[in-house]
Swiss-Prot record:
Its main location: periplasm. GO terms for cellular component: outer membrane-bounded periplasmic space. InterPro entries: Ig-like_fold, PapD-like_sf, Periplasmic_pilus_chap, Pili_assmbl_chap_C_dom_sf, Pili_assmbl_chaperone_bac, Pili_assmbl_chaperone_C, Pili_assmbl_chaperone_CS, Pili_assmbl_chaperone_N. It comes from the Bacteria. This is Uncharacterized fimbrial chaperone YbgP. It is found in: Periplasm. The keyword Signal applies. One of its GO terms (molecular function) is protein folding chaperone. Residues 1-20 form the signal peptide.
Length: 242
């Protein structure tokens, strides 16, 4: 069975791989600087077709580069329902990365389908789906204690329908939920990532209340909910698991 050479007719990039035949087993990667490499599992969920899986790393600007981290193997074949591994290996040049904060990369994987049957009389549009997940390089100096929730250090202030999110930590904080309650996000809200020691603004739309539910993503990609009370100085409090 042959595979398409070059770019397919249509390329779709998605963040979580939810519609892809070949999917990674996680939605984010934390690479601890003390480790030589980190691994993730990929799976071909197709019952009938083999796929090629093409993997590479991009920096924060979306530029493809293997100068700091490299994905191995860069390309591999997965038979139907087969699983395999991709190793992300650090290069010696990672010593040049900041030691006082995380650095953001992206792991990308593009599935390449087999070429269509040439004997078919029907026109076929093939779509190559590309998964893209965040990869956080965590310096050796940053060590979270068991159960530590650095996300609760997020500093929030409210002015009208605008929330200012200030991250005083050395970690990337991803705010994936903002709502009046736990039943749904505010209309128009989009996930916000706040880089270490930086500030980002987000809009609350037509909602002018002072109480919110705010959800952040932990190291394992799980959504953790907090309550946010902005009567005076905004205060974050973790929501206890039910």
């Amino acid at each position: 069975m042959t595979f398409i050479k070059g770019l397919p007719l249509m390329l779709l990039t998605i963040s979580l791989g939810c519609n892809a035949a070949v999917q990674p087993d996680r939605t984010r990667i934390v690479f601890n600087a003390n480790d030589k490499a980190t691994s993730l599992r990929i799976e071909n969920q197709s019952d009938k077709l083999p796929y090629l899986a093409y993997s590479w790393i991009e920096n924060e600007k979306g530029e493809k580069s293997d100068a700091l981290l490299v994905a191995l193997p860069p390309i591999q074949r997965l038979e139907p329902k087969a699983t395999s591994q991709v190793r992300v290996v650090k290069q010696a040049s990672t010593t040049q990365l900041p030691g006082d904060r995380e650095t953001l990369f992206f792991y990308n994987m593009r599935e390449i389908p087999p070429a269509p049957d040439k004997s078919s009389d029907h026109a076929i549009l093939q779509v190559a789906i590309q998964s893209r997940i965040k990869l956080f390089w965590r310096p050796a100096a940053l060590r979270k204690k068991a159960g530590e929730k650095v996300e609760l250090q997020l500093q929030v202030s409210q002015q009208g329908n605008q929330l200012t999110l200030k991250n005083p930590t050395a970690y990337y904080l991803t705010i994936a939920y903002l709502g009046r309650n736990e039943k749904g996000v505010l209309p128009g809200f989009k996930t916000v990532m706040v880089a270490p020691f930086s500030t980002v603004n987000t809009n609350t739309g037509s909602y002018s209340g002072s109480q919110f539910y705010l959800g952040y993503m932990d190291d394992y990609g799980a959504l953790r909910m907090t309550t946010l009370n902005c009567s005076g100085q905004c205060r974050l409090q973790a929501v206890e698991a039910k």
